Design a protein with these regions (language model features):
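Conserved structural motif at the start of ABC-family nucleotide-binding domains
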Residues: 4-6, 18-19
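The feature captures the beta-strand-to-loop junction immediately N-terminal to the Walker
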Residues: 35-37
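ABC ATPase signature
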Residues: 107, 149-150, 163-164
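Helical segment within the ABC ATPase nucleotide-binding domain
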Residues: 186-200
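ABC ATPase NBD Q-loop/coupling interface
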Residues: 59-88
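A short, proline-enriched helix->beta-strand linker immediately N-terminal to the Walker B motif
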Residues: 165-169
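ABC-type ATPase nucleotide-binding domains, specifically the catalytic core motifs of the NBD
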Residues: 14, 53-61, 107-127, 135-137
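Conserved small/polar residues in nucleotide/adenosyl-binding loops
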Residues: 208-210
Length: 210
């Protein structure tokens, strides 16, 4: 049994199957890559592990939209979290950095980071903030700039930093290299390796290419 175990997971939208009977086990402290083409179900898997798929399902049901069916089980550290809300999963240490980054474009870099650390203690927030700035020194000079005025690469650094402020034990990175220049891909890739090595965080990332 790993830190995170997925058993017989099936997710389908109306008649389209997004995830078909997946069984996976992620060991603690590892970097796990999930590779696939567009529309292969990578984002759906990330949303399902983080629990955000449950919010999407509720919204679709409320507006009479697309029906989403989820079957199977997800165990985290031996506990069944299949029905837990995403906020509770985040409190337990499962944090998603989504493909579209979803930073607050009118808020500054510092404000975005503080929002990410809302559940952290003051000591945790300060230590993590110092670590983020050592990981991404560029964010220091950009700390007062609104998120909407950052480049794609700068937004990705901020999104990863904000996720770290939430004190994850499992960090889900959905397409962290999407739309980045080769140079910025190297920066982000190096940062992912450093985060895993320095903080022992289990990292699951989805990628279209290697």
């Amino acid at each position: 049994m790993g830190l995170l175990d997925i058993t017989d997971l099936i997710v389908f939208y109306e008649n389209a199957i997004a995830i078909n009977n997946i069984n996976m086990s992620f060991n603690k402290g590892r970097i796990i890559g999930i590779f696939g083409a567009n529309s292969a179900g990578k984002s759906t898997l990330m949303y399902t592990i983080s629990g955000i798929i449950l919010d999407v399902k509720k919204k679709e049901e409320m507006k009479g939209g697309e029906r989403i069916t989820i079957m199977g089980n997800i165990l985290y550290d031996g506990q069944d979290i299949t029905s837990l809300e995403p906020s509770e999963r985040a409190r337990r240490g499962i944090v998603l950095c989504p493909e579209r980054r979803r930073i607050f474009i009118e808020s500054s870099v510092m404000e975005n980071l503080r929002i990410g650390g809302i559940l952290a203690t003051k000591r945790q927030a300060k230590e993590t903030l110092d670590y983020i700035f050592s990981l991404f020194p560029t964010l220091i000079k950009l700390r007062n700039r609104p998120g909407g005025f950052l480049s794609g690469g700068e937004q990705q650094m901020l999104a990863i930093g904000r996720a770290l402020m939430a004190q994850p034990e499992v960090l889900l990175l959905d397409e962290p290299l999407l739309g980045l220049s080769p140079a910025m891909e190297d920066v982000v890739t190096d940062a992912i390796e450093d985060i895993n090595k320095d903080r022992g965080i289990t990292i699951v990332l989805s990628l279209i290419h290697i």
